[in-house]
């Protein structure tokens, strides 16, 4: 997403973290949640990917009772979007689409070129790539995937 500023939803993320739920967030811009605080958000990571493209997907993925649930949305998690705008969120049922979205999320979570992780004090640092790790620029990789899609896949 682009922004996470809604206090109610941030508190829900903290509750989930305290219940032992692992939460990985990709928030391109403003993020008021603070990850990695003991007994508050120690199970939460926040990363930001800012590159050539104004890219911020709004994919919401949940693993619930052994079932993978995927949703796409028009909304960032901002109070104004939750309270004052008409937004939409819809589920993804297609197994094929779930596989593609999973691939995209894995690519974004593997980015070690443009990705930065947020520290508990709100500062960001670039993700460090291990020497034996391949270089992953998620925006470039996703661009190449989109460019290579055949007409029969559209």
Question: Could you tell me what each predicted segment is?
Answer:
Residues 1-154:
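PLD/PLD-like phosphodiesterase catalytic module centered on the HKD motif
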């Amino acid at each position: 997403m682009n922004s996470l500023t809604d206090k109610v939803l941030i508190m829900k993320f903290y509750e989930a973290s305290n219940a032992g739920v692992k939460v990985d967030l990709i928030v391109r811009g403003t993020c008021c949640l603070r990850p990695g605080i003991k007994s508050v958000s120690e199970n939460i990571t926040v990363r930001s990917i800012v590159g050539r493209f104004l890219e911020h997907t709004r994919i919401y993925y949940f693993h619930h009772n052994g079932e993978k649930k995927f949703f796409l949305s028009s909304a960032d998690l901002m109070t104004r979007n939750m309270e004052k705008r008409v937004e939409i969120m819809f589920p993804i049922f297609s197994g094929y689409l779930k596989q593609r979205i999973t691939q995209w999320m894995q690519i974004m979570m593997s980015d070690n070129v443009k990705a930065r992780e947020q520290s508990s004090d709100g500062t960001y640092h670039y993700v460090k790539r291990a020497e034996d790790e391949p270089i992953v620029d998620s925006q470039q990789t996703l661009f190449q995937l989109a460019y290579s899609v055949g007409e029969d896949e559209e």
